[in-house]
Amino acid sequence: QAIISVIGSDMSRFPTDRHISSWAGLCPGDNESAKKRKSGKTRKGNALLRTTLITCAHAAVKNKKSYFYAQYMRISAHRGPKRAYVAVAHSMLISIYHILKDGVIFKDLGADYYNQFNKERKINAYLKKLKALGWEVPVVAA
């Protein structure tokens, strides 16, 4: 209710999901110079919407069988928990935008989404690590 009271139910004022995330102050910063990438601060946006979404992200991460938990674990390992919560809040806002604009039903991708994504790539990476450790492993499909 708090989210809809802030953004409204009419999404025609936001042409794309990037516009609403920028308005909310949840768009990721991207500063690149000479092939060096530095993350920037998120811009000032609607404080009520931002804090509400980050609070919702805290709650969504508690369910260990959800896509948001998998996203949080993947990002927090490298970037830290606070940035991971902001990233989850950003994903939630994009989902809310498409639910309100297009009328689609939310479908949770599940916690194993990232494991199924690029399965071949992960297999090759693990085989390469084992080979570097001196192990030769035959590959047999299960």
Describe the role of every protein-language-model region:
Residues 1-86, 116-117:
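Phosphate-backbone recognition surface of nucleic-acid-processing proteins
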Residues 34-39, 71-75, 79-90, 95-142:
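Low-complexity, acidic/Ser/Thr- and charged residue-rich accessory regions of DNA metabolism proteins
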